From Swiss-Prot:
Its EC number is 2.7.13.3. Member of a two-component system Hik34/Rre1, controlling expression of at least 20 genes in response to hyperosmotic stress (0.5 M sorbitol) or salt (0.5 M NaCl). Represses expression of heat shock genes under normal growth conditions. Required for survival of long-term heat shock exposure. It comes from Synechocystis sp. (strain ATCC 27184 / PCC 6803 / Kazusa). Coiled coil: none annotated. When expressed in E.coli autophosphorylates at 18 to 30 degrees Celsius; less phosphorylation occurs at 36 and none occurs at 42 or 48 degrees Celsius. One of its GO terms (molecular function) is phosphorelay sensor kinase activity. The modification Phosphohistidine is found at residue 238. This is Sensor histidine kinase Hik34. It comes from the Bacteria. Residues 235-449 form the Histidine kinase domain. Disruption phenotype: Loss or reduction of expression of about 20 genes in response to hyperosmotic stress (0.5 M sorbitol) or salt (0.5 M NaCl) stress. Increased survival after heat shock from 30 to 48 degrees Celsius for 2-3 hours. Increased expression of some heat shock and photosystem-related proteins. Cells die after 24 hours of heat shock (32 to 44 degrees Celsius). Increased expression of some heat shock proteins during normal growth. Keywords: Kinase, Phosphoprotein, Stress response, Transferase, Two-component regulatory system. Induction: Expression strongly induced by heat shock at 44 degrees Celsius for 20 minutes, after 60 minutes expression has fallen. It catalyses: ATP + protein L-histidine = ADP + protein N-phospho-L-histidine.
Length: 464
């Protein structure tokens, strides 16, 4: 089988791993699998800190993930090579030419593994991790019934097969690090793990399961059909996104050329940026229509312990660049240390980005956005104070979900839908309008206060 056409879940299915629990309703397969995935990711860093006390030796660890990085601990980030599987339209060209063999630096880089259009790996979330003591694969994919399934394994054979699949993609992407990765992984030699490691990680995953909820038994009932308006909106967002993705793929290819003038490159970068903004907007609208059309008994967004500090560190520079293009100044007052909150980090970043875009495109002649984060009892208070130089551009309702700005042609989610999204994210949004040019938006998010028990294992494991 061509490794580039292989999904990682195919490795588990072909190895005889079980399918979904037939005692559960199929509509709960995805939220249940997501819950298990979030629990495993939350358990990973505590597990690595406990089992790899001497991080920083001759052979650093390797962590290949998709579609986003999973390691955020500063010590682990310094000592793990990280590769991120990235759709081709989001891929940034390698900073050095293929064939150049790099060396491990003091802080290993975070490289991108380009996924070409239609690559089935883009449909999965995974973390492939290798150290001298053990290897681990975490995967949110699909089972043989086509339903969402969470898999995890320390099995060296499956880890080796997964590496062959990832290695093929690195070859096609002309990774400058491939030779060094091959040598390092050959030195690790896919070790057989100590059984205590497997037991310990399994216990940690149970300890870190996010916001448990009861999944109902399977009941035969007809699913509510989405309204024609919702179906039309979903179809339109798809039709808009598809050509924009193609255009963005072409701009990425053009940006790799060395024979273009600075002025041409500047214009291509502008096209790429506008396509990216539109794609993000369409993604959020599509996600919102999907959630709004889901019947209440089935409407679940799995929540997990979320580093709000990481969300804002990644988002604020991006939002500031976006604001500057519309002559808007975004100032942020972020405390040095923030408690973690219960939320969904991926959707939270998406919704916050949509709010920022709504602000900056609604301002008439520029303006200011002040972001301030404070604690309020057992909650974090995130407040946006927005002020336009002139009266904000008028908007009008477009159906039950959207707002439309006739002057700019901008589409955005209305405040009712945005409030519903924050409620699903474990928070609350309050919108207060002081004047036609000034608004204050306050978001409350529940702080994570539990103490997670840690199994009583030795800090160091003697491997045999």
């Amino acid at each position: 089988m061509n490794e580039v056409c292989l999904k990682l879940s195919d490795l588990f299915v072909s190895s005889g791993w079980g399918g979904y629990d037939r005692g559960r309703a199929p509509q709960w397969a995805h939220p249940r699998a997501q819950q298990q995935w979030f629990g495993a990711i939350a358990a990973l860093e505590p597990f690595l800190r406990q089992t790899l006390p001497n991080v920083g030796g001759e052979l650093p660890g390797i962590c290949l993930t998709g579609p986003a990085p999973v390691l955020k601990d500063a010590v682990l980030v310094r000592n793990f090579y990280q590769g991120i599987a990235t759709p081709w339209e989001e891929f940034s060209p390698w900073p050095c030419l293929a064939g150049e063999e790099s060396e491990w630096s003091a802080v290993p880089p975070m490289r991108e593994i380009p996924l070409f259009p239609q690559d089935p790996l883009a449909e999965e979330q995974f973390c492939w991790l290798m150290t001298p003591q053990f290897g681990l694969l975490l995967l949110l994919g699909k089972n043989e019934q086509g339903l969402a399934q969470f898999y995890w394994t320390f099995d060296p054979e499956i880890l080796q097969q997964a590496w062959l699949s990832l290695q093929a993609r690195l070859k096609y992407g002309l990774s400058p690090d491939l030779s060094l990765l091959q040598k390092t992984i050959a030195a690790f030699n896919f070790p057989q793990p100590d059984f205590r490691l497997v037991t310990y990680f399994g216990q940690l995953m149970l300890d870190y399961q996010p916001n448990p909820y009861n999944l109902p038994p399977c009941q035969e009932q007809e699913s509510a059909e989405p309204s024609p308006d919702v179906e039309l909106l979903q179809a339109l967002t798809h039709e808009v996104r598809t050509p924009l993705t193609s255009i963005r793929t072409l701009t990425k290819l053009l940006l790799r050329r060395k024979d273009l003038s600075p002025e041409v490159l500047k214009r291509i970068e502008s096209i790429d940026r506008e396509c990216s903004d539109q794609i993000s907007r369409m993604d959020l609208i599509f996600r919102a229509t999907e959630l709004e059309s889901t019947p209440l008994p089935e409407l679940v967004v799995p929540l997990t312990v979320t580093s709000l500090e990481a969300v804002f560190q990644a988002g604020i520079p991006r939002w500031q660049k976006q604001a500057q293009r519309y002559n808007v100044n975004l100032q942020a007052q972020i405390p040095h240390s923030l408690p973690q909150v219960w939320s969904n980090p991926s959707l939270l970043d998406q919704v916050l980005g949509g709010m920022i875009e709504k602000f900056v495109r609604n301002f008439n002649g520029g303006g200011e956005i002040n972001l301030q984060i404070t604690t309020a009892g057992d909650q974090l208070k995130v407040q946006f104070h927005t002020q336009s130089v002139h009266q904000a551009n008028p908007v009008r309702a477009l159906g039950e979900l959207l707002m439309f700005q006739p002057q700019t042609g901008c589409l955005s989610l209305n405040w009712d839908v945005t409030k519903n999204l924050f409620q699903l994210l474990g928070g609350k949004l309050i919108v207060r309008r002081r004047s036609p040019s000034e608004e204050i938006l306050t978001i409350y998010l529940k702080c994570e206060q539990r103490t997670v028990p840690v199994a009583n294992y030795d800090r160091q494991f003697t491997m045999v």
